[in-house]
């Protein structure tokens, strides 16, 4: 049975996060302490230093030889179920579009919505919000599990999301009509057609996509911070090597800024927007439904199917209801795909997550 003391622990863990977010919001919206360029500099500091050190610190503390494979498999199964459901919806929409004369318009749009829907339903803020929250709810073992999920999300699912974005970009470029020929000579026309066919074939080849995704992943500090953290965890747990105190202290001094600066940066981002809801009420409701209902429901099915029960089942469901990952908005903005929807999901979802997560915590407390 969940008591008020347990609820207070959750609120006490979340309140400092909202305090940092409120300071960031007020420093721009009310006190005018930062300009837009200075906000970009703060965001850059967070993205390149604070969060990567935070991710490395927690990844280096896990035991790679004692991973909870059932929890990770349940998470993967739920993501696969969401991807298949979105693909089925896109195929059905494309079929209806073709049947009504919509033709080509349905396919590309369907794939775009699959990417956005997958981001909304499955990719959440596991590290910044999840670690302190689940530590308060269930203790150290829950914190260790959420770090495992976060590391897998960083080094597996984010690169896959980048791959999907690059595939969409390549297919969109390949589908673009070639420029009209400048001359009327038959040989010129044939040469132009051959060149267009060659260019299209090159665009469709796999290697440019793999290379583009690899470069994006290699430039992402969070990815190689997670990989380096796991590598160091393998060394320390395999050969029982202690991290030198000088290195541990150097990492910790930056890692401790990760949560606070991330929430502060999110507050800066919120203050720079004209309004919290920028994509309309309908899409906002859809995004919140995917974030707080569809994602946890898919995770519950996957976790139950793999035999998770008790606190493991509760943790799996609650981590799926965490706020939207900020990284998904960064990718959406970079690739120009529904950035306004992801922006609303990050801002409004973060504000709404506290009562939603408390409700999940209380309701799941009755499940045995």
Curated annotation (Swiss-Prot):
Q: Which residues form a coiled coil?
A: none
Per the UniProt entry, what are the Gene Ontology biological process annotations, in alphabetical order?
auxin export across the plasma membrane; auxin polar transport; auxin-activated signaling pathway
As for subcellular location, the record says: Membrane
Q: Which GO terms describe its molecular function?
A: auxin efflux transmembrane transporter activity; identical protein binding; protein homodimerization activity
Identify the Pfam families for this entry.
Mem_trans
**Keywords assigned by UniProt?**
Auxin signaling pathway, Membrane, Transmembrane, Transmembrane helix, Transport
The answer, when asked if Membrane is one of the entry's keywords, is yes
Residue ranges annotated as transmembrane are 7-27, 39-59, 71-91, 114-134, 145-165, 227-247, 251-271, 286-306, 312-332, 347-367
Q: Which GO terms describe its cellular component?
A: cell periphery; endoplasmic reticulum; plasma membrane
Q: How does it sit in the membrane?
A: Multi-pass membrane protein
> Which tissues and organs express this gene's product?
Expressed at low levels in roots and shoot apex.
* Family statement drawn from the similarity comment of this UniProt entry: Belongs to the auxin efflux carrier (TC 2.A.69.1) family.
Q: What does this protein do?
A: May act as a component of the auxin efflux carrier.
Q: What is this protein called?
A: Probable auxin efflux carrier component 5b
Species of provenance = Oryza sativa subsp. japonica
């Amino acid at each position: 049975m969940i008591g008020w003391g347990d609820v207070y622990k959750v609120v006490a863990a979340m309140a400092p996060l909202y305090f940092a977010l409120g300071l960031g919001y007020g420093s721009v919206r009310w006190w005018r302490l930062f300009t837009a360029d200075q906000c970009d500099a703060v965001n850059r500091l967070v993205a390149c230093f604070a969060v990567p050190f935070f991710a490395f610190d927690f990844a280096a503390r896990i035991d790679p030889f004692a991973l909870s494979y059932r929890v990770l498999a349940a998470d993967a199964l739920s993501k696969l179920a969401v991807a298949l459901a979105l693909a089925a919806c896109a195929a059905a929409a494309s079929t209806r579009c073709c049947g009504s004369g919509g033709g080509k318009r349905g396919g590309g749009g369907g794939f775009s919505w699959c990417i956005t829907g997958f981001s909304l339903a499955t990719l959440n803020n596991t590290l910044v919000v999840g670690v302190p929250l689940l530590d308060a709810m269930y203790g150290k073992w829950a914190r260790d599990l959420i770090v495992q999920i976060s590391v897998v999300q960083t080094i597996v699912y984010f690169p896959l999301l980048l791959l999907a974005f690059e595939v969409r970009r390549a297919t969109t470029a390949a589908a673009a009509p070639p420029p009209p020929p400048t001359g009327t000579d038959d040989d010129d026309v044939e040469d132009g057609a051959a060149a267009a066919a060659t260019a299209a074939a090159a665009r469709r080849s796999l290697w440019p996509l793999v290379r583009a995704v690899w470069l994006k992943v290699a430039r992402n500090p969070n990815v190689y911070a997670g990989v380096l953290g796991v590598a160091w965890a393998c060394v320390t747990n395999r050969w029982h090597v202690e991290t030198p105190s000088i290195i541990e202290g150097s990492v910790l001094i930056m890692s401790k800024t990760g949560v606070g600066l991330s929430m502060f940066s999110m507050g800066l981002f919120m203050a720079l927007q004209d309004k919290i809801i920028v994509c309309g009420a309908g899409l906002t409701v859809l995004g919140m439904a995917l974030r707080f209902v569809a994602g946890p429901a898919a995770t519950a099915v996957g976790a139950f199917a793999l035999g998770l029960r008790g606190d493991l089942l509760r943790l799996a469901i609650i981590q799926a209801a965490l706020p939207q990952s900020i990284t998904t908005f960064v990718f959406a903005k970079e690739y120009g795909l529904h950035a306004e929807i992801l922006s609303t999901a990050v801002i409004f979802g973060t504000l709404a997550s506290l009562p939603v997560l408390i409700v999940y915590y209380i309701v799941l407390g009755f499940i045995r």
